[in-house]
């Protein structure tokens, strides 16, 4: 399945919530009515079946983290093999992706922008270039912006945006050095409360 590159508003309208795909802090503008699903039909959002609710939650999380369907299923399988709650394991794996960590540290204004930085070899992990967005960052790893990329306006702009965003506790960032430490795997209580990972577990358990 190809990665979606169309209007970000359309995805948020599909899920009925702002997925914050346009920037880390900027809400969707007034022209994007997330209460109405995309398309030319009426404004009513159809009532979903139990399966439909589970599917929409999976799609929402997949789109938030920018993960393709096959990748997402593989993450679920890995989460199911791990110790502890499968849903929590799944979210922790998604949070540990390098592109997500770059976003959380404020070097990219969106996960898509962070993914592009990684793909363009603008990011170092423990002083070594890594260009794989799905690379799993480990506690203690140092993630930094490569020297030649530090003057990019998009990186500086992202850091400015990040200063307006509530910081997360599992990363420690030196904005001046454009470097940060992935301190620990986040606990479920530290992750977004508007995600119901149990619905995803129920979906894949069928």
UniProtKB/Swiss-Prot annotation:
The record's section on InterPro entries has:
Ribosomal_uS4, Ribosomal_uS4_bac-type, Ribosomal_uS4_CS, Ribosomal_uS4_N, S4_RNA-bd, S4_RNA-bd_sf
Q: Does the keyword Ribosomal protein apply?
A: yes
User: For this protein, what is any one GO molecular function term?
Assistant: rRNA binding
Alphabetic keyword roster: Ribonucleoprotein, Ribosomal protein, RNA-binding, rRNA-binding
Gene Ontology BP, a term: ribosomal small subunit biogenesis
Record-linked SUPFAM superfamilies: Alpha-L RNA-binding motif
One GO cellular component from the entry? small ribosomal subunit
Q: Where is the S4 RNA-binding domain?
A: 96-156
> What family, per the record?
Belongs to the universal ribosomal protein uS4 family.
- What does the record give as the function of this protein? One of the primary rRNA binding proteins, it binds directly to 16S rRNA where it nucleates assembly of the body of the 30S subunit.
The record's section on HAMAP family has: Ribosomal_uS4_B
What subunit structure does UniProt give?
Part of the 30S ribosomal subunit. Contacts protein S5. The interaction surface between S4 and S5 is involved in control of translational fidelity.
Q: Which NCBIfam families match?
A: PRK05327.1, rpsD_bact
Q: Please state what the protein is called.
A: Small ribosomal subunit protein uS4
**What is the organism field in this record?**
Marinobacter nauticus (strain ATCC 700491 / DSM 11845 / VT8)
Please state the gene responsible for encoding this protein.
rpsD
């Amino acid at each position: 399945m190809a990665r979606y590159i169309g209007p970000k508003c359309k995805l948020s309208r599909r899920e009925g919530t702002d997925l914050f795909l346009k920037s880390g802090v900027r809400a969707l503008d007034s022209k994007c009515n997330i209460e109405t699903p995309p398309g030319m039909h009426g404004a009513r959002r159809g009532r979903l079946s139990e399966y439909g609710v589970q599917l929409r939650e999976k799609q929402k999380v997949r789109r938030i983290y920018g993960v393709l369907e096959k990748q997402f299923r593989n993450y679920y399988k890995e989460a199911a093999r791990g110790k502890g709650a499968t849903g929590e394991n799944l979210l922790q794996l998604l949070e540990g992706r390098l592109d997500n960590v770059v976003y959380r540290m404020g070097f990219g204004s969106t996960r898509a922008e962070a993914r592009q930085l990684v793909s363009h070899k603008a990011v170092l992990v423990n002083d070594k270039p890594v260009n794989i967005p799905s690379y799993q960052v480990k506690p203690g790893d140092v993630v930094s912006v490569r020297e030649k990329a530090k003057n990019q306006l998009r990186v500086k702009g992202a850091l400015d945006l990040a200063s307006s965003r509530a910081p997360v506790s599992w990363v420690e960032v030196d904005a001046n050095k454009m470097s940060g430490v992935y301190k620990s795997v986040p606990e479920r209580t530290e992750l977004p409360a508007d995600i119901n990972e149990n619905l995803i577990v129920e979906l894949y358990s069928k």
